[in-house]
């Protein structure tokens, strides 16, 4: 019986691991999309290319806990930490959606060390477009 080979390293043989290059972007934009079910924070460069992102689900919350302000706070801190590795120091904030994590996410971006410039609400308003979902009866 031949001897067993030692376990291979975590990287597969012949496969290159892609190295993420560090961009140097001092000023960016933070897009906070806060829905009733989740909060997504994306930090972009001035052209709109995403540098860092995080969401309540990505941070580790599941189900109804994703929609809490605390989950939005952790998602914003996580995205801010990743963006600071790319040199982001100042952001303009664009908030979209009706969710509960809007204000908390903005506050935690400031607390994480990013300087917040302008804050704009870019929630899309329908000109009587799609029919909204029916009322819940609990």
Curated annotation (Swiss-Prot):
Keywords: Ribonucleoprotein, Ribosomal protein, RNA-binding, rRNA-binding
Region of interest: Disordered: 1-28
Positions with biased composition (Basic residues): 13-22
One GO molecular-function entry: structural constituent of ribosome
An example Gene Ontology biological process: translation
Keyword RNA-binding recorded: yes
Compositional bias of kind Low complexity: 1-12
Single GO cellular component term: ribosome
Role: Located on the platform of the 30S subunit, it bridges several disparate RNA helices of the 16S rRNA. Forms part of the Shine-Dalgarno cleft in the 70S ribosome.
Family: Belongs to the universal ribosomal protein uS11 family.
Oligomeric and partner information: Part of the 30S ribosomal subunit. Interacts with proteins S7 and S18. Binds to IF-3.
NCBIfam families the record matches: PRK05309.1, uS11_bact
PANTHER family given in the database record: 40S RIBOSOMAL PROTEIN S14/30S RIBOSOMAL PROTEIN S11
Descriptive protein name: Small ribosomal subunit protein uS11
Species the sequence originates in: Mycobacterium sp. (strain KMS)
